[in-house]
Amino acid sequence: MARFFRRRKFCRFTAEDVKEIDYKDLNTLKAYVSETGKIVPSRITGTKARYQRQLATAIKRARFLALLAYTDSHGR
């Protein structure tokens, strides 16, 4: 049976020495939201718990201000 090589996950925010995640930085936030609009969990992205909490808050703020969609367009 062949074993698959699993890439080591790392926290992008720690590597870039980010102090605070901004809700106006939509390109960063979109990378952590799935196609259906759900926030991607840290066990998949490798984000540390501190930044995952900041990320969730920033995504929720951006959604509230209509900068990000709550869900996908449902393909109508």
Swiss-Prot record:
Belongs to the bacterial ribosomal protein bS18 family. HAMAP family: Ribosomal_bS18. This is Small ribosomal subunit protein bS18. PROSITE patterns: RIBOSOMAL_S18. Pfam families: Ribosomal_S18. GO terms for molecular function: small ribosomal subunit rRNA binding; structural constituent of ribosome. One of its GO terms (biological process) is translation.
